[in-house]
Amino acid sequence: GYMDMRECHEGTRAMVGRTAPPSGTTMKHLKPKEAVEFLQKHPQAVFVDCRSEMEYLFVGHPVGAQHVAWNDGPDWEINPHFVGQVKKVASMNRPIVLICRSGHRSVDAGLALEKAGFAEVYNVVDGFEGPLDDKHHRGTLSGWRMEGLPWEQL
């Protein structure tokens, strides 16, 4: 069937409903409001927005999030330096909270961090904009922005 091109770059793996987390992962999942509470309680945690630079700048991003793209345009290739760039902003023993647009890329990014030895990885469920509604709009069903949590854009 026809698939919106913007959907494609998240990969077909993300399109299959992930019921159980892959084995060997200790990743935890937080709803946006839970993520805010977690970050307030754990000042040592590092909040990473792993969307593309364009999304981060122009769609807006959560206040306090560091930007490290998991994949970026024009070809949406995986950023080979992702883990190294996260290591620059966070040590391996600090909790990492990951957010993307709707919660798919952040799971893949989180698995890569776990493989690299990060002990405490959290994924923000529904991401910044949430899933598409029946009118193909994001930001109406769930997600960071719809829940009225602090965000900014340029």
Residue ranges and their predicted role:
Residues L98-I99:
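Short, surface-exposed ligand- or partner-binding patches at beta-edge/loop junctions that are enriched
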Residues D49, G103:
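Conserved G/P- and acidic residue-centered "switch" motifs that form tight phosphate/ATP-binding loops
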Residues G1-A45, E53-P95, S106-L154:
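Rhodanese-like catalytic fold shared by cysteine-dependent sulfurtransferases
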